[in-house]
Amino acid sequence: HILPGSANLIGGRGVTVKNLQRNTINSMKFPDAPHSLKMACGENPKRVYGNRQQAPSTRMGNAAGYRKSWIQAEAYLSRLNEYEAKSDEAKELAYKPQRDLEMDTLAGVLRGDILVHNHCYRAEEMATMINIAKEFDYKITAFHHGVEAYKIADLLAENNICGALWADWWGFKHEAYDMVQANIAIVDQALGGKGCAIVHSDDAIGIQHLNQEASKALAAGLRAGFDITKARAMNWITSNPAKAAGIYNQTGS
């Protein structure tokens, strides 16, 4: 699954592809897979734009930026729905809303057609993003990186949100310090095993060794006292990623 960037509050659409030899990129797209939307919170947006003396430059500014965009998207979708509800005769006399590609994507999220994948590290910010999602009635499919996901594992499970997490990578920036090696296992075992944990990597080498990454996460969970089978851990690199990509009806089991 390919996602665009993590420096913008709302980065753009993602796509699921098959690693097959094809003559065009479009022909590599996984059939009938939904698009996704990459969002990012925390240090990345506020650092990139703050260094340019632009907003957002704070975490509070990040939250304000999301809410402003979703308010615009709600208004855009309302205009579209109002126009589409008219009869063909009325449409000929009515003003057709001007198309906006950014708003098209956000409207797709509000309709439930596009899956939200959210780059986020800190527990309180993931909770903030969940609150914003509830305010504007959209669904977060997965938080990515989430080194503090273990702190809110039950909250993620309650809201049916997956955690796409590293097995043992942290400490490379301030918001990535408060990590535990049992992070994936804790998310998996939330609410009596109702959590959705994913072993992920955005590293070109690490992504080739997800089985080994899953083994490390499983070992950490066992050391922490969780009774997790190897079969259960396989879900972290098979069925759970397929669910998060919206293709579980075709692959992943």
Task: Identify the function of each model-found stretch.
Residues 1-142, 248:
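Polyanionic/metal-chelating signatures
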Residues 97-101, 121-124, 148, 175-179, ...:
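Short secondary-structure boundary/capping elements
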Residues 105, 125, 151-152, 183:
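Short acidic active-site motifs
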Residues 126-134, 152-157, 214:
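Distinct, well-ordered alpha-helical segments
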Residues 7-8, 148, 171, 205:
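Positions that flank functional sites
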Residues 123-125, 146-151, 239-242:
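Short acidic loop-to-helix transition motifs that present clustered carboxylates
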Residues 115, 154-157, 161-253:
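His/Asp/Glu-enriched, well-ordered alpha-helical/loop segment
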Residues 3, 119-121, 143-146, 164-168, ...:
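Generic beta-strand/beta-sheet core signal
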